[in-house]
Amino acid sequence: MLASLIIFVALLCNVTVISGLNDEGFALLTFKQSVHDDPTGSLNNWNSSDENACSWNGVTCKELRVVSLSIPRKNLYGSLPSSLGFLSSLRHLNLRSNRFYGSLPIQLFHLQGLQSLVLYGNSFDGSLSEEIGKLKLLQTLDLSQNLFNGSLPLSILQCNRLKTLDVSRNNLSGPLPDGFGSAFVSLEKLDLAFNQFNGSIPSDIGNLSNLQGTADFSHNHFTGSIPPALGDLPEKVYIDLTFNNLSGPIPQTGALMNRGPTAFIGNTGLCGPPLKDLCQGYQLGLNASYPFIPSNNPPEDSDSTNSETKQKSSGLSKSAVIAIVLCDVFGICLVGLLFTYCYSKFCACNRENQFGVEKESKKRASECLCFRKDESETPSENVEHCDIVPLDAQVAFNLEELLKASAFVLGKSGIGIVYKVVLENGLTLAVRRLGEGGSQRFKEFQTEVEAIGKLKHPNIASLRAYYWSVDEKLLIYDYVSNGNLATALHGKPGMMTIAPLTWSERLRIMKGIATGLVYLHEFSPKKYVHGDLKPSNILIGQDMEPKISDFGLARLANIAGGSSPTIQSNRIIQTDQQPQERQQHHHKSVSSEFTAHSSSGSYYQAPETLKMVKPSQKWDVYSYGIILLELIAGRSPAVEVGTSEMDLVRWVQVCIEEKKPLCDVLDPCLAPEAETEDEIVAVLKIAISCVNSSPEKRPTMRHVSDTLDRLPVAGD
């Protein structure tokens, strides 16, 4: 630091001889002097003979004052000089992915107008100064992938405008400061992974109501129980608590519900759902998770001596045993009579209507419903449900209301007809009618549909209820009014115009799809594979938030007799929009290792799906990569080149081989947004890695999602 100050003073002494540079210009020259290696020559045009520094690479000025210094990914090697403190108007400092080392100068924290400090991917070390609390306007703090140590200073809570806090992959330790959750109510991204943090997770963590993506506490040394307040985080947030020292029952509240066991692995002391380990010895927690277990039940781990004593003291007399047996026999007979009565009612029910259910059955629907999903065990394979079977506690409609509703066809496919249904109360639903077979496979159908119904995530289309009979199977979803991604990108026959998606909208869609797939792959009960991901299966909800649909549909259709398991589903739930169409112009480029794939099957299917192999999550990664290419290029997966046709992956490969500029690959509708070029290139590189012909070389969806989360979306 002393050396940099001497250099700075020496430069100031020569100000009249050298040029008219102001103090900020000389501060930047001191920064250049502190860089010992500049292999790309990124600082070559930083010359003392210039009138000001505003034309230098990486420097942005406003009214001749430096407001931004951004020199990422240049492999610069050096340290930060204290002279940076003279950049009094600096708002943004981005030095990510270089080779800077040493501690951060205290003067850096005196830049009270600083809004973003992005230093990830360097070798900075030392502890964070208490002076950091002076950065009251700071919104982005990314210090990940460095060598920082010590604890988070208490003063960091004064940076209460933070939206991004990423200190992952350092050597930070100690507990999180008290009041952590209450201080950062504006926080949208939190990543504390791969450090040495210890102590308990703050009880006020649920106050982070604006969090998005993944709240990552993984690979630390957090102890104690999981605070129930953690469930108060938005449902869209993934909570990663893996590989800590947490113990006790997992609270079944809010964002912690419907999480698969992978979110909690590496914590040997945790118990209760979704883990298989029951909470022995945590009586209060056990009752919280299982409300029907009385609090005076003895613990299961009582010693054998006590157990034997209890067995002796609780023995039953012969008369009591005989009475119990007689009651059981009477009960079985009563159940048999009830079942016979209900079965006769089932056979009397006749169904045919606008979905295949006859109008006269409306009057008898309530009589037929003897077995509801929440009232009894599954009946025989030939059972017929005469009412809607809800998969969501909020389902408040029945079959009779559904039959009275106005309905019209939205589309048809090989897996049945899709209707838009508007109930009398205004609720709009999408109803898919499956085949008329599968009468002997009810249990199989029920198992599948209930598993799908448990998937609750903002980026997964919700299956609300179903209906089953020998002649009819209906799947009932929330209606999504903005159509699907295929229509949003390319229009459909009969459309005259279509409003092009902006880059921000496309990026939001990319992130949402990735987030939904991460949920399917890592947080769903069985680590599912979608297997049929394509734009027509991506519905567009409010604020351009995507919803992945048709998960498990091909399997259900096969059970219902509507299709072969090899037929790919093609959901056609679309909006009542104005007729639109887009001309297919389009174009872009960048380099990486990948191999094109083309076959007579779906362009979205990975090459290995042509072999009879077990479904893999890497299939979905490949399909996602094709969708990314489609969003960037604005082209269909089959590209017309002259009189011939080429698949999109091969077309991009040709553009790279011919070293075409990015604008030749980019959708022309995105051309005016030239300032987003770095983001587009970053996404293109992700897409290319996703469509690698080798499944092992494709990234996981978690890695893809985390990478995309680093890219800001306008309006977020």
From Swiss-Prot:
Expressed at the micropylar nuclei of the embryo sac at eight-nucleate stage before cellularization, but not in chalazal nuclei. After cellularization, expressed in central cell and synergids in mature embryo sac. After fertilization, detected specifically in zygote, endosperm precursor cell, and later in endosperm. In addition, also present in sperm and the vegetative cells in both pollen and pollen tube. Expressed at high level in the egg cell, the central cell, the endosperm, and at low level in the zygote. Residues 1-20 form the signal peptide. GO terms for molecular function: ATP binding; kinase activity; protein serine kinase activity; protein serine/threonine kinase activity. Residues 695-709 have a biased composition (Basic and acidic residues). Disruption phenotype: Embryo lethal when homozygous. CDD domains: STKc_IRAK. It is a single-pass membrane protein. LRR repeats lie at residues 87-111, 113-135, 136-159, 160-183, 185-208, 210-233, 234-258. Residues 557-584 are annotated as: GBeta-binding. It catalyses: L-seryl-[protein] + ATP = O-phospho-L-seryl-[protein] + ADP + H(+); L-threonyl-[protein] + ATP = O-phospho-L-threonyl-[protein] + ADP + H(+). Gene3D superfamilies: Phosphorylase Kinase, domain 1, Ribonuclease Inhibitor, Transferase(Phosphotransferase) domain 1. SMART domains: LRR_TYP, S_TKc. The chain crosses the membrane at residues 320-340. It comes from the Eukaryota. The modification Phosphoserine is found at residues 406, 616. InterPro entries: At_inactive_RLKs, Kinase-like_dom_sf, Leu-rich_rpt, Leu-rich_rpt_typical-subtyp, LRR_dom_sf, LRR_N_plant-typ, Prot_kinase_dom, Ser/Thr_kinase_AS. It is an enzyme of class 2 (transferase). Belongs to the protein kinase superfamily. Ser/Thr protein kinase family. The CaMBD domain (358-373) is required for calmodulin binding. The GBeta-binding domain (577-584) is required for GB1 binding. Part of an in vivo complex containing ZAR1, CAM1 and GB1. Interacts (via CaMBD domain) with calmodulins CAM1 and CML8 in a calcium independent manner. Interacts (via GBeta-binding domain) with GB1. Component of an immune signaling complex made of, at least, SZE1, BKN2/SZE2, ZAR1 and ZED1. Binds directly to SZE1 and SZE2 at the plasma membrane. This is Receptor protein kinase-like protein ZAR1. It comes from Arabidopsis thaliana. The gene is ZAR1.
